[in-house]
Amino acid sequence: MNVLDHLKQKTLDEVKSYCKNTCIDAGVAMMHVSGDFNLSTLVRNANFFGFKEAMYVGGSKQWDRRGTVGTHHYTDLNHIKTEEMFVGYLKDNGYTLIAVENNIPKYSDKTVSIFNQWVFTGIDKPMFVFGEEKSGLSDYILDNAETIVTIPEYGSVRSLNVGTTSGIVMAFYRNYYEY
């Protein structure tokens, strides 16, 4: 069982209860239209940083859970079939849609660097949504986002791996939330 030492003797329900009691009111989601190996990393990161829930949008309910090292048992994970249903879910549940994307000049008016000290100011109950490795986020999601967070690149590569990006964003938000 890959849990903190003080949780090793706890039951599955006790560990899940611990996670619910220590999580913050924030969520993460990943587009999953054609399948993506990064979903398990997103779920593991959500658990590690104490996010309330993780979601995947599109595709099928089938995905490779091995990369979660069991965290999918303790962090709520929901599958939503369409982007429209996802946006509706967020509105019905009081989430603020925050897209995480890069290289999209069309949306420069609502794009902000994660290094901007005010990046999360005024955002309550965020749901950070990440695109698939090859296709990114659709215009529908970007149009419905309150803001778009980007991680500036300083080298030659165009983008980061989505799993890595999710960990960076969650770490930055958890730090903002705590301090």
Residue spans for each PLM region:
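Post-transcriptional modification and biogenesis factors for structured RNAs
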Residues: M1-Y179
